[in-house]
Structures are given as C-alpha cells and as structure tokens.
Amino acid sequence: MKFVLLFGVLLVTLFSYSSAEMLDDFDQADEDELLSLIEKEEARKDRIPKHHECTSNKHGCCRGHLFKYKCQCTTVVTQSGEETERCFCGTPPHHKAAELVVGFGKKIFG
C-alpha cells in the first residue's frame, strides 16, 4: 500500500511539473507572437499611403495590390521662382499596366 501511495505522489508530481513546463512554453509562444504583431504594426504605421507626400522618406511607401508604391518626384517652381522637389507615393505606369493585365486575366480565367 505504501508503494502505491508513493508511486501515486511521484506520478502527480511529475504530471504537475510537465504541465507547468507546457504552460510556460505556451506563454512564451504567445508573448513572442504578440511582440511580432506589435513590430509589424509599428512598421505599417511608418509606411506612407498612396498619393501622400514622400519627399523626406523616399523608400517608405506602402504596398499596393500587387506592387509596392514608388516615390515619384517632380520639380515645382514656386511663385518666388525657387525650384523645389515634391514627391508622392504612386503606382508607376508599367505597374499599372501589369495590374490591368492581371485584372483582365482574373475576370477571364478566375
């Protein structure tokens, strides 16, 4: 009887230890996933949407449907005669053509 009781206590102790280890692993995985999501959200907030100014951050444009938007710049002459560069995030013409072809392909085959 003592042997069965000792074996039972040992079994319960091992079971509680292993379940505690598994819970710690799950908690760590949840924390890692949460940190990853927070980092992605921060990176997304730093991105510049389409048609917004990107003069100070030319590589920070968002992604479009298929391609990343490109920072397109033009030179503007102000009323005082100064030339300044103004940039905006947009879709280049060759990307627009590719998106149009893909859109037609989806309508025909999709």
Curated annotation (Swiss-Prot):
Coiled-coil intervals: none
Propeptide residues according to the Swiss-Prot or TrEMBL record: 21-44
InterPro entries according to UniProt: Spider_toxin_CSTX_knottin (IPR019553)
S-S pairs: 54-71, 61-89, 73-87
N-terminal signal peptide: 1-20
GO cellular component term, pick one: extracellular region
Tissue: Expressed by the venom gland.
Name used for this protein in its record: U1-lycotoxin-Ls1gg
Primary localisation category: secreted
Sorted UniProt keywords: Disulfide bond, Secreted, Signal, Toxin
One Pfam family linked to the record: Toxin_35
